[in-house]
Regions:
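Feature recognizes metal-dependent phosphohydrolase scaffolds
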Residues: 2, 14-343
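Bacterial N-terminal signal peptides that target proteins for export
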Residues: 1-8
Length: 343
């Protein structure tokens, strides 16, 4: 054994003595795109303008990084086409040495739990009906499986990308902790709904309100039995299983000030909030935040707290939902962040 180890140690020593490369790798080009909401043509157009795809919608961005900050879904009839494009580019970019990062938005989460209030008849038609769309975004569905692997935050080269923001109730956790928490909450929802379906308390892929009501009814039934001393340990475990469904409105998935819905980054007054923004940047060891969620007036990307926060939802879907909206992207190269528009 000793004679085998000596050559390895010698080889490691020789490697350690080699001089480091003299050239430093340049920062990778990052292109961030905000809320798409089914505007498939506009999404493809801004990616083309940014030099990421060709006329056939194939990746030509090389080592560039595309970040989409959530809300690909709902409202626009091209929702499925836009999702398919993003999913396809993820694989193509990886093979070319680049990357695609898809961030969860509140509308993706809504779709995953079966809340389809912002889906239109035209969207349902592209899936073959409302029931088929629910299946597609369920735990075993084509889009549901893909989305359940996606984060709420991505930290890339000194920038944190997210859909909405980080409110006062979420200042302490790390980004990894926040990402793990949202994944746990989605998994807990799925597990609770599976029980409700299996026990025939709800139909397959129920609407969220039906699942919440059924979960609460079952918990109340178990509590009543517990007061009479008739509840079994299995019933207690069932109640724990159903609590995340019954109380999903208080989870980070749907809380008004949670990371999926918070609008403070757009609404905070500049001077009072500057210290808080600086604290957040220091907490997460980054130089800037990039977020969507809140449509910016005039269809232009907004820079706040000079250079520290960029709001990139410019209402890409356009009329009638966002009359002044237009496609846009934020191009980040090292220290520089530059808005990009079609016109």
């Amino acid at each position: 054994m000793t004679r085998v180890l000596y050559p390895l140690v010698l080889a490691l020593a020789l490697i350690a003595l080699r001089p480091a490369a003299a050239t430093l790798e340049q920062p990778r080009r990052i292109v961030a795109v905000g809320d798409v909401h089914g505007a498939a043509d506009a999404f493809a157009a801004i990616l083309t303008r940014a030099g990421l795809i060709d006329a056939e919608k194939r990746w030509i961005g090389g080592r560039a990084i595309l970040v989409q900050t959530g809300d690909m879904t709902d409202r626009g009839a091209g929702m499925r086409e836009a999702l398919d494009l993003l999913m396809g580019l993820e694989n193509q970019a990886s093979k070319a040495g680049g990357a695609v990062h898809a961030i969860l938005g509140n509308h993706e989460v809504m779709n995953m739990v079966g809340e389809l209030r912002d889906a239109t008849p035209q969207i349902f038609e592209t899936f073959g009906g409302e029931a088929a769309m629910r299946d597609a975004f369920g735990p075993k569905g084509h889009y549901g499986r893909w989305l359940r692997r996606k984060p709420m935050f991505a930290k890339i080269d000194g920038t944190v990308f997210m859909h909405a923001g980080i409110g006062p109730d979420y200042l302490k956790p790390s980004l990894d902790e926040l990402n793990r928490n949202v994944r746990r909450e989605i998994e807990a929802w799925d597990e609770g709904v599976r029980w409700l379906v299996r026990e025939k308390r709800v139909t397959t892929q129920p609407e969220p309100r039906a699942a919440m009501d059924a979960a609460r009814a079952e918990i109340e039934r178990i509590n009543a039995l517990a007061e009479e001393g008739k509840a079994t340990p299995d019933m207690g475990r069932t109640a724990q299983l159903l609590l995340p469904v019954a109380n999903v409105g208080q989870s980070s998935l749907f809380a008004e000030n949670g990371p999926m819905w918070f609008r403070g980054f757009s609404l905070w007054e500049e001077q009072p909030a500057l210290q808080l923004i600086d604290q957040l940047l220091e907490r997460h060891r980054v130089r800037r935040f990039v977020t969507g969620h809140t449509v910016q007036r005039g269809g232009t990307i907004t820079e706040r707290f000079p250079g520290k926060l960029f709001l990139i939802d410019t209402g890409m879907l356009g009329r009638p939902s966002f009359p002044n909206g237009r496609p846009s992207a934020l191009v980040i190269e090292g220290e520089t962040a530059t808005p990009l528009y079609l016109h």
